[in-house]
A protein has these predicted regions:
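Transmembrane beta-strands of outer-membrane beta-barrel pores
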Residues: 43, 60, 74-78, 87, ...
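Hydrophobic, lipid-facing positions within transmembrane beta-strands of outer-membrane proteins
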Residues: 54, 68-70, 77-81, 130-134, ...
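Face-selective signature of the C-terminal outer-membrane beta-barrel domain
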Residues: 137-156, 183-338, 413-416
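Residue-level signature of outer-membrane beta-barrel architecture
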Residues: 60, 74, 85-87, 138-140, ...
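Predominantly transmembrane beta-strands of Gram-negative outer membrane beta-barrel pores used
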Residues: 8, 36-45, 53-61, 68-139, ...
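Short acidic/polar hinge/loop motifs at secondary-structure boundaries
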Residues: 14-40
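Outer-membrane beta-barrel channels and translocator barrels
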Residues: 4, 34, 65, 77, ...
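Outer-membrane beta-barrel signature, preferentially recognizing the C-terminal barrel domain
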Residues: 178-197, 301-305, 366-424, 434-435, ...
Length: 441
């Protein structure tokens, strides 16, 4: 019931702004490296915020603490590898690590076929993607653990076409050597780093502090160049022209978060925390035309912005009985471009009909302060153009009402069926000739 920009996708708690390869044909997530996933189609608790649709937090494997091991997989279009093991003995610190990587190789296969057919010099397959992830855990002592997590993934499209022509006219004694080159470089992807400190303050209180950087960049660079030299009799000369077009969108997201979990009251699990998120947006377009003695530079699009979101949340899970549980919470938010504070109440209920079957209800309000500038009628979404919510636009929000049932099978498979109602306000969409158009409902 939501658009892609209204859903928060995370890896180890870090926001992933472009969670797919090749427009969604391939997932960003390497399934071999996944430990578990926390998914909420709606009605998610107060500890999550920033989106008004759904939440998916993919948690990577911790790594094997006992022995070194690995596996590799080869398919028709890609290869992937995963290795993991305990920290080296010389570190004198218990812990584990995991490294996983993946790359498509149909570009290499197709190029090899083209070379064998004699066409490889003129034509090459232009696209591939790759990604890798690293996770390191260090148990400094029984009460303190540090976790470093990194993800790096790119889609790459490269096109290179060049030619070299010679012309000679014996009657006019004219000779010309002409070279032309056309090149497209188009990388886009996500790069993330995070460091998490978990502190077991006492048996009833756990603190978690998290610092992360998530960077998404899309960069389309096209260059066309022609140059040459000529001779007619005793006269000689040179020439050269170049045209370049550069289109880019860069998001730099820095997040600081702390969370406390307290189990000091019977039948209650209390959580509270704060989050500071600073996001820099840079959307731009540049043209350049040059010849031997003149350069013309145009910059028709240059949108730079910085926003800061500050959030406080608290939630309590109350086990009223062996069959009934409530989850009540709220999230208070400040958006740097707006003067007012926003409060999102959250409520959840779970009733156990029997040991393997439960009924769930969730209600809540959810605010969002960023959007995308993609056309509504876009059929294939390869990349997204993210923008912060302008100061003159009201905050977007949605009210959720979710009712569902869950069934846990004997093999620990969880089946869920839900019906939902989501009411959206102040939506912003891109229309022909306008950057932003507000939809009130």
């Amino acid at each position: 019931g939501s658009t892609p920009d209204q859903n928060l996708i995370m890896m180890d708690g870090i926001t992933i702004y472009n969670p797919y390869h090749l427009g969604g044909i391939f997932s960003t997530f390497n399934t071999d490296a996944i430990k578990e996933a926390d998914f909420h189609a709606g009605g998610f608790p107060a500890r999550y915020g920033g989106r008004m649709g759904a939440i998916l937090n993919v948690i990577n494997r911790e790594g094997n603490t006992e022995k070194f091991q690995g596996n590799a997989n080869v398919s028709l279009v890609s290869s992937k590898i995963l290795i993991e093991g305990p920290t080296p003995k010389f570190m004198k610190t218990k812990g584990s690590w995991m490294v996983a990587g993946r790359r498509t190789y149909f570009d290499q296969v197709i190029n090899a076929i083209l070379r064998s057919s004699g066409a490889g010099k003129e034509v090459k397959f232009p696209y591939y993607f790759y990604d890798y992830q690293i996770k390191v855990n260090l148990d400094l002592n029984p009460d303190h653990r540090l976790t470093y997590s990194r993800f790096y993934g790119d889609d790459v499209l490269e096109i290179n076409v060049s030619s070299n022509e010679e012309e000679y006219d014996v009657y006019s004694d004219y000779y010309e050597n002409r070279k032309s080159k056309f090149k497209i470089e188009w990388p886009w992807g996500n790069h993330t780093n995070s460091l998490t400190w978990r502190w077991l303050v006492n048996p009833k209180l756990v603190a978690r502090t998290f610092i992360a950087n998530s960077r998404y960049r899309f960069h389309f660079d096209m260059t066309a160049r022609e140059e040459g030299d000529w001779r007619m009799g005793s006269e000689t000369g040179t020439y050269g022209d170049q045209f370049s077009f550069d289109f880019f969108d860069i998001i730099d997201d820095k997040t600081l978060e702390t969370e406390l979990s307290w189990h000091g009251i019977a039948n209650h699990q209390l959580k509270g925390g704060a989050q500071l998120k600073r996001v820099n947006y840079n959307l731009g377009m540049e043209f350049e035309f040059s010849n031997l003695d003149t350069t013309l530079f145009l910059n028709p699009l240059n949108m730079k912005d910085e926003t800061v979101e500050t959030s406080l949340f608290i939630q309590d899970k109350w086990d009223v009985s062996s069959k009934l549980a409530f989850q009540i919470g709220g999230r208070l938010m400040d958006y740097s471009l707006h003067k007012e504070l926003y409060f999102d109440p959250r409520f959840g209920l779970k009733y156990l009909l029997r040991q393997d079957l439960s009924l769930k209800l969730a209600l809540g309000r959810y605010h969002q302060f960023l959007t995308i500038a993609n056309p509504e009628d876009e059929t294939l979404r390869i990349i997204d153009f993210w923008l912060g919510l302008p100061a003159d636009r009201p905050a977007m929000y949605a009210d959720h009402a979710i009712l569902g049932v869950e069934y846990l099978s004997e093999k620990n498979w969880l089946f869920r069926a839900e019906t939902y109602y989501k009411h959206f306000e102040n939506l912003i969409t891109l229309k022909q000739g306008e950057l932003f158009t507000e939809e009130t409902d």
